[in-house]
């Protein structure tokens, strides 16, 4: 049914629904040890990206940025004290498992497009800098990432002592902080060390969800008065 819907023609928002449905199929397939191949959907999406991705910069949605490069500005327009948690390499499939640890946290979910190429040095820097790849100081290296984020935060109106860039789950933010980026590499590390493909990711993410580190970190920052935005890159 998904493939038929794609062949009939998709608008960009249709892909958000398709991604969620595909993730659920993949999750159930891993959970019940079924051999369901959804790779055709990936191929059809690649075809759509080649023809239509370039048009997305002209799209607008008041409820969510369309491209990841507009995220920081969008967040600043709705929050004056926030933490953006970047789960490096997270997919819709990954989130479908991790979200089970958020049973006691109310949240809303939105979808948007990563930057192409989707390598970390490009897409994550675009996310944290509010820039397109062509405007990055160094799109092929992450050495300037923190600097890009800090410059972006200042352009959005934050002072130096209100900005924090850190990694991992156990950071303590100073009382002066109003704009923070937290980078978490667990999923990306899991992907690169994976030998059992989807089943291995399912098992690893299930353990990660049971541990609840991400949810605990979110709760901690919420109690400190921050709005929390968890995103992939």
Task: Spell out what each predicted region is.
Residues 1-83, 89-232:
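…; additionally, a secondary subgroup of soluble metalloenzymes is captured
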């Amino acid at each position: 049914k998904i493939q038929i819907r794609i062949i009939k023609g998709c608008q960009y928002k249709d892909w958000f629904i398709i991604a969620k449905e595909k993730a659920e199929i993949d999750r159930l397939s891993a959970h019940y040890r079924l051999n369901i191949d959804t790779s055709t959907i990936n191929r059809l999406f690649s075809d759509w990206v080649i023809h239509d991705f370039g048009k997305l910069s002209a799209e607008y949605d008041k409820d969510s940025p369309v491209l990841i490069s507009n995220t920081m500005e969008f967040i600043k327009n709705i929050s004056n004290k926030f933490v953006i948690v970047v789960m490096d390499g997270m997919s819709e499939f990954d989130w479908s498992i991790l979200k089970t640890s958020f049973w006691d946290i109310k949240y809303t979910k939105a979808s948007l497009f990563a930057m192409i190429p989707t390598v970390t040095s490009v897409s994550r820097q675009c996310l944290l800098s509010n820039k397109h790849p062509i405007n990055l100081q160094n799109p092929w290296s992450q050495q300037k990432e923190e600097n890009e984020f800090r410059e972006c935060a200042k352009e959005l109106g934050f002072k130096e002592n209100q900005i924090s860039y850190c990694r991992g789950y156990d950071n303590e933010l100073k009382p002066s902080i109003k704009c923070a980026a937290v980078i978490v590499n667990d999923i990306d590390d899991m992907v690169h060390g994976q030998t059992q493909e989807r089943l291995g990711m399912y098992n690893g993410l299930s353990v990660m969800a049971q541990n609840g580190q991400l949810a605990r970190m979110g709760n901690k920052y919420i109690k400190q008065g921050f709005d929390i935005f968890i995103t992939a890159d």
